[in-house]
């Protein structure tokens, strides 16, 4: 019975509705795409209930783009990590069957700015002071070197559930060579992500190292509604934003909890040393069948941890983030 139910969910996901332009507008298109992910994850859930489930991390070129992806099939979620940007391009939470990495990117024709990179989770940038000032305002600021980089595999161990990637690029108009080593250690509840940013050249430089994550809209009751709640610990003091509808920038952050109020699922970030944070909702527009004027197609909540740094030639800095998915049944409480 479970296998039959799983097959029906797969059929629903494969009907092709997610690829059609609805006469109802572009926002319902997003809802249909999320429904397709939901049906796929539901099929996965049925199969897990029918046969013994074993957590795994595998490496294969699943989308036939010439580069391996890493598929993490864990107790609370499934995730796909791409070599492009070294980022999480799918994050399907088993509890509510949603894909939290299903985000658009801004296109100048419709959104008046170009992002020039894909908006997943754990997307890294290196910005100058001026670029970072624009970034915090949601303005065009370039791709930040690593968000468009093709990361290569340094080491993969499926048994240890460990992925090591390395990205390379150049910084500023001086073309300073820099590299970023990125280590994912995958567990049942989330990830530990370790970074080593290195100045590969002889010239010292300073900047901001930014780790960006984008959370897709799951509440479709209102196109421009932000359904995420934000809780922070800044310099030992708790700060809460019931709906973070405006940009938020804070420093001395040791704890971040982003909660999807439509499902009560939380995502917790705990950096190994205090960081800054920049958060804001972003609206994406696309044309629909009934109007040449772009309409709201999606609302994404963007949260970025950042650190200022100075790097002499040949030197490096290390940062680590623990990322935990908390479902309603087992919620960790922390005084804030």
Enumerate the predicted regions with their spans:
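Hydrophobic beta-strand positions in extracellular immunoglobulin-like domains
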Residues: 184, 196-198, 323
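Glycine- and small hydrophobic-enriched segments that form the cores of compact globular domains
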Residues: 71, 77-78, 82-87, 91-167, ...
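Histidine-centered catalytic/metal-binding microenvironments
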Residues: 1-91, 95-122
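Short, isolated positions in well-ordered beta-strands
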Residues: 77-80, 248, 317
């Amino acid at each position: 019975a479970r296998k039959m139910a799983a097959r029906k969910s797969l059929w629903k996901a494969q009907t092709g509705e997610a690829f059609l332009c609805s006469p109802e507008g572009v926002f319902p298109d997003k809802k249909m795409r999320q429904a397709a992910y939901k049906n796929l994850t539901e099929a996965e859930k049925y199969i897990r209930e029918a046969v013994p489930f074993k957590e795994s991390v595998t490496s294969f070129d699943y989308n036939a783009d010439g580069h391996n992806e890493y598929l993490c099939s864990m107790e609370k979620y499934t995730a796909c990590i791409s070599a492009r940007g070294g980022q999480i391009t799918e994050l399907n939470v088993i509890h509510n069957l949603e894909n939290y990495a299903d985000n658009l990117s801004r296109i100048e024709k419709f959104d008046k700015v170009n992002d020039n990179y894909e908006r997943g989770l754990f997307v890294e940038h290196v910005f100058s002071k001026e670029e970072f000032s624009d970034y915090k305002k949601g303005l065009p600021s370039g791709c930040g070197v690593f968000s468009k980089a093709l990361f290569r595999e340094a080491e993969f161990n499926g048994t240890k559930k460990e992925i090591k990637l390395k990205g390379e690029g150049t910084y500023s108009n001086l073309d300073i060579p820099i590299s970023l080593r990125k280590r994912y250690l995958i567990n049942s509840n989330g990830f530990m992500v370790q970074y080593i940013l290195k100045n590969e050249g002889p010239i010292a430089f300073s900047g901001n190292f930014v780790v960006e994550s984008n959370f897709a809209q799951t509440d479709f009751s209102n196109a421009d509604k932000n359904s995420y709640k934000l809780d922070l610990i800044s310099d030992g003091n708790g700060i809460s934003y019931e709906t973070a509808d405006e940009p938020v920038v804070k420093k001395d952050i040791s704890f971040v909890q982003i909660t999807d109020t439509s499902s009560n699922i939380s995502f917790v970030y705990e950096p190994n040393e205090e960081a800054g944070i920049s958060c804001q909702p972003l609206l994406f527009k696309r044309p629909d069948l009934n109007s040449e004027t772009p309409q709201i197609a999606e609302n994404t909540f963007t949260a970025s941890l950042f650190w200022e740094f100075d790097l002499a030639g040949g030197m490096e800095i290390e940062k680590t983030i623990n990322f935990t998915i908390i479902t309603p049944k087992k919620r960790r409480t922390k005084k804030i």
